[in-house]
Amino acid sequence: MDYKSSLIQDGNPMENLEKQLICPICLEMFTKPVVILPCQHNLCRKCANDIFQAANPYWTSRGSSVSMSGGRFRCPTCRHEVIMDRHGVYGLQRNLLVENIIDIYKQECSSRPLQKGSHPMCKEHEDEKINIYCLTCEVPTCSMCKVFGIHKACEVAPLQSVFQGQKTELNNCISMLVAGNDRVQTIITQLEDSRRVTKENSHQVKEELSQKFDTLYAILDEKKSELLQRITQEQEKKLSFIEALIQQYQEQLDKSTKLVETAIQSLDEPGGATFLLTAKQLIKSIVEASKGCQLGKTEQGFENMDFFTLDLEHIADALRAIDFGTDEEEEEFIEEEDQEEEESTEGKEEGHQ
């Protein structure tokens, strides 16, 4: 964590320092002990343990007598995969530097007088700060508006209580959206595997088909090209469908990621009023985005290409009529041949009589 460069970027070093000391999980100042991940991001050890336990539900605690092989989870900041040994998060190194900075920061804050920060003012009463929230109109306002102004008949609540409530709701929405992004990423991985298996299966049936045609290549050369083309068309059709799905899910993931970034930036607003001016619409957008992820998927057995297999146990006169078929069609063909042979035999016997 580059604290020096972060502090230089703005004119208020203490506010910037406080932002650097916020845990991305609990959204509060780091609680000691603070652990540092391999990707160099920091977490409260309690928060790190919470997400580790959520990602590894069958991992037992440090005091268990059962020998565990460890587990893994993703850094909430950069999504880098963190691999743990059998000690879990207790095997992570403590960031003593950050802990010392937190102590110094708290001492500095306790010794400094409260400073007047920027606070939104009421548009109707320019000398009044926005300090209450109108529940009826769902907007922040000032006390004068409640006593004498347009919100006189409205129901109001303390700004801080509404701020905390909507902040909690937004946190829950972010968690829900992040979980949805993980599911989308899983689907993308599955689709990529599906694409690979489809290619492998297509290659396999092509090889099998080529080997069977080699025995009768002189007769089947033209037919061979035709059937291979059909397999290729089916492969391209399936791969085009899968590629389109991957692109749709990737676009959904990109939109969700941008929305998460916007929401996290909104959480960094130091004042409740500024936050509440945009929080309602932001929460609505996140909920709609979470409900809107209704994209298509491949059906079970989509990658299967077995219906292109061929059995070349046919007489030479039937070679030019060969096509991909089912077992039932082949059985009917055999039954028709047997019936023709029986009729021919019966006719010969009647002729001898």
Swiss-Prot record:
Catalytic reaction(s) noted: S-ubiquitinyl-[E2 ubiquitin-conjugating enzyme]-L-cysteine + [acceptor protein]-L-lysine = [E2 ubiquitin-conjugating enzyme]-L-cysteine + N(6)-ubiquitinyl-[acceptor protein]-L-lysine
Segments forming RING-type zinc fingers: 23-79
First and last residues of each zinc finger (B box-type): 117-159
Alphabetized InterPro entries for the sequence: COS_domain (IPR017903), E3_ligase_FN3/SPRY (IPR050617), TRIM63_RING-HC (IPR042667), Znf-RING_euk (IPR027370), Znf_B-box (IPR000315), Znf_RING (IPR001841), Znf_RING/FYVE/PHD (IPR013083), Znf_RING_CS (IPR017907)
Matching Pfam families: zf-B_box, zf-RING_UBOX
Tissue expression summary: Muscle specific. Selectively expressed in heart and skeletal muscle. Also expressed in the iris.
Comment on protein domains: The RING-type zinc finger mediates interaction with SUMO2 and localization to the nucleus. Also required for the E3 ubiquitin ligase activity.
Protein name (Swiss-Prot/TrEMBL): E3 ubiquitin-protein ligase TRIM63
Source species of the chain: Homo sapiens (Human)
Gene from which this protein is expressed: TRIM63
